[in-house]
Amino acid sequence: MYRFKIYYPGKTKAKFIKEGIDHYIKLLSPFAKVELIELKEGHGDKEKVTEEESKTILNSLKGDFILLHRDGKSLSSTEFADFIKDKSLTQFVIGGVYGVNEAVFKAASFRLSLSSLTFTHEISRLLLLEQLYRAITIIHGKSYHY
C-alpha cells in the first residue's frame, strides 16, 4: 500500500475543488493511504507570509519531500508513475499563495512541475491527486490512462 502525504498551508475553500479532492482520495483508497496535512496559513505582507509558511512547512516534515514548483522538472504521467512506484511513502509540499522561500526550495529532494502554466495552490492540490491516481492506475495496469 502506497502512502502519500501532502503538506500545504491554508484551507481548500472552493467547494468544487474539495469535491474533486474527495473524489480522487476515494479512488486512491484501494491502493494508497492519502494524508492531507493542512498547515497554518501565514498573515501579513508577502515576505512575512512566505517566511511563516515556509518555516511551518520545514518544521512539519520528516524526511525527503517533493516540492511542487513552477521551476521544477516536468515528467510525463508514465515517468511520474515510474518515479513513485518503488516508494512506500512519498511526501509532497505545495506552497501557499506566494509559494515558498529558498530554504524550502533547497531542502526539497526533488522539485516537480505540474505544468509550465501557473495554477492556484488550491487547483494544484486537485491536480496532484489526479496525477497520483493516474500513476497508480499505470502501475497496476488499470484502464484510466490512455
Swiss-Prot record:
Subcellular location(s) per record: Cytoplasm
Keyword terms, alphabetized: Cytoplasm, Methyltransferase, rRNA processing, S-adenosyl-L-methionine, Transferase
Listed name of the protein: Ribosomal RNA large subunit methyltransferase H
Enzyme Commission numbers on file: 2.1.1.177
The organism's place on the tree of life at top rank: Bacteria
Function, as annotated: Specifically methylates the pseudouridine at position 1915 (m3Psi1915) in 23S rRNA.
Subunit and partners: Homodimer.
Binding locations of S-adenosyl-L-methionine: 68, 95, 114-119
HAMAP family in UniProt: 23SrRNA_methyltr_H
An example Gene Ontology CC term for this record: cytoplasm
Matches recorded under InterPro entries: Alpha/beta_knot_MTases, RlmH-like, tRNA_m1G_MTases_N
Matches recorded under SUPFAM superfamilies: alpha/beta knot (SSF75217)
Natural source organism: Thermodesulfovibrio yellowstonii (strain ATCC 51303 / DSM 11347 / YP87)
Disulfide bridge positions per record: none
Catalytic activity, reaction form: pseudouridine(1915) in 23S rRNA + S-adenosyl-L-methionine = N(3)-methylpseudouridine(1915) in 23S rRNA + S-adenosyl-L-homocysteine + H(+)
GO molecular function: rRNA (pseudouridine-N3-)-methyltransferase activity
Similarity field: Belongs to the RNA methyltransferase RlmH family.
Main location group: cytoplasm
Top-level class of the enzyme under EC nomenclature: transferase
